[in-house]
Curated annotation (Swiss-Prot):
Sites of the Glycyl lysine isopeptide (Lys-Gly) (interchain with G-Cter in ubiquitin) crosslink: K86, K96, K132, K177
Protein name: E3 ubiquitin-protein ligase RNF146
Function field: E3 ubiquitin-protein ligase that specifically binds poly-ADP-ribosylated (PARsylated) proteins and mediates their ubiquitination and subsequent degradation. May regulate many important biological processes, such as cell survival and DNA damage response. Acts as an activator of the Wnt signaling pathway by mediating the ubiquitination of PARsylated AXIN1 and AXIN2, 2 key components of the beta-catenin destruction complex. Acts in cooperation with tankyrase proteins (TNKS and TNKS2), which mediate PARsylation of target proteins AXIN1, AXIN2, BLZF1, CASC3, TNKS and TNKS2.
RING-type Zn finger ranges: 38-76
Lineage: Eukaryota, Metazoa, Chordata, Craniata, Vertebrata
Source species of the chain: Mus musculus (Mouse)
SUPFAM superfamilies in the cross-refs: RING/U-box (SSF57850), WWE domain (SSF117839)
Amino acid sequence: MEMAGCGEIDHSINMLPTNKKANESCSNTAPSLTVPECAICLQTCVHPVSLPCKHVFCYLCVKGASWLGKRCALCRQEIPEDFLDKPTLLSPEELKAASRGNGEYAWYYEGRNGWWQYDERTSRELEDAFSKGKKNTEMLIAGFLYVADLENMVQYRRNEHGRRRKIKRDIIDIPKKGVAGLRLDCDTNTVNLARESSADGADSGSAQTGASVQLAVPSSTRPLTSVDGQLTSPVTPSPDAGISLEDSFAHLQLSGDSIAERSHRGEGEEDHESPSSGRVPDTSVEETESDASSDSEDAPVVVAQHSLTQQRPLVPNGNQTVADQSDRSGTDRSVAGGGTMSVNVRSRRPDGQCTVTEV
């Protein structure tokens, strides 16, 4: 049994090619597994990327497929929207090695605010055509056929000649954005995105507009002002209005009980009669004084009400019943005649507070 086992082992070894040994076959098959083939271009992958479904393709092949259907070419699973911006590279070191290049020169195509380096396969095709003196050559990029015009140094799609992009042959060490649409550094990615947006003027304009709006909002608001410790509305009156208001307050303070009573009536308050009164008002004199001073006193009362309306309403529906209640109060007094009555007068001070005075 042991000899049979050895014979089988020897037979399996003899099945290998004569120019290779078992150790050599194992060492040679390992690297071949690290270079997958692309099911789209049917060639070895250039900058292979892995989709969420674990299928591997060339980055440019996935880019072309996403333009057409945004689905995997094998299982039809959807490709994420941000996959082209953040692809899953199988060998990031290969990308950096490709940016350094193998020779002295490399081929580039024009991008926004910079140049992109062609992938290794396309660069070899361009260099071969250039060295042979060809005027143009065709390239398969992202599933589309492009024509490289080596005389005018432009490239365009074979079925769309209107859109042209500059190309050039330059040294390998020039500043570049990346290789075949893949950026070399994440930090550079952020900087370049900001510069591209600012070059268009969209982000810069929106940023300036946002700043102007933020600056305009606080300038339109004013702090609350105070009159004798009481807050008033944010709208500040003119200097003339402030002077007239102060004069009216001083006039109200110097006036007697008759002025306070008339201001009380002007606000729509009703008189409260009491049998224990000690004064008989002279209605004829009061009516004459009220008629003479109504024009001078009603104005400051209205101004004071307007300045304190937003903070504290004094008496509701006062302006609607001024004339009616004034006439009614005069009638009640004339009917009372020489009788005795007591009036509780509530006058308003300049600071907005009310006091009750017995007469």
